[in-house]
């Protein structure tokens, strides 16, 4: 999808394209295999993996470590790329493409920034609602493979 932009000074016209927004999500598991989730402060309201938008000039790995720290206070020791999810319907706000990382982290989770709560939950007993496609991502991680679709 595009629309035309016209410079108000010189009259030059160019196309502006809507593009997907790049995001990252962190899957952090404790020694019992429970998954870290945050309760979101902003819509869509519900529970989600820690994560967010990649800043200009930032690597995916740095972005996931930053978002994890901002939302939970945890520090990433190591990050391993798991899969990239790109279903245009995965985020009700706009088309996002999210790279998911398995993260080994230190510290105790404490809600900050966009999170009002943070805690670990068994993958088979997640709180409701889990927003975006994060329940699917968690299932993919638990089963060690990605289900069909994007």
For the regions a language model picked out, list residue spans one by one.
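Active-site-adjacent beta-strand/loop module that shapes the phosphate/pyrophosphate-binding cleft
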Residues: 85-109
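Acidic, metal-coordinating catalytic segment for phosphate/diphosphate chemistry
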Residues: 1-25
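A short coil-to-beta-strand element that immediately follows conserved catalytic motifs
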Residues: 74-83
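Conserved Nudix-box catalytic region and its N-terminal flanking loop in Nudix hydrolases
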Residues: 30-71
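Residue-level preference for beta-strand/loop junctions
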Residues: 6, 20, 45, 77, ...
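Conserved hydrophobic "DFG−1" position in protein kinase catalytic cores
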Residues: 28-29, 37, 103, 120
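NUDIX/MutT-family hydrolases
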Residues: 100-102, 110-143
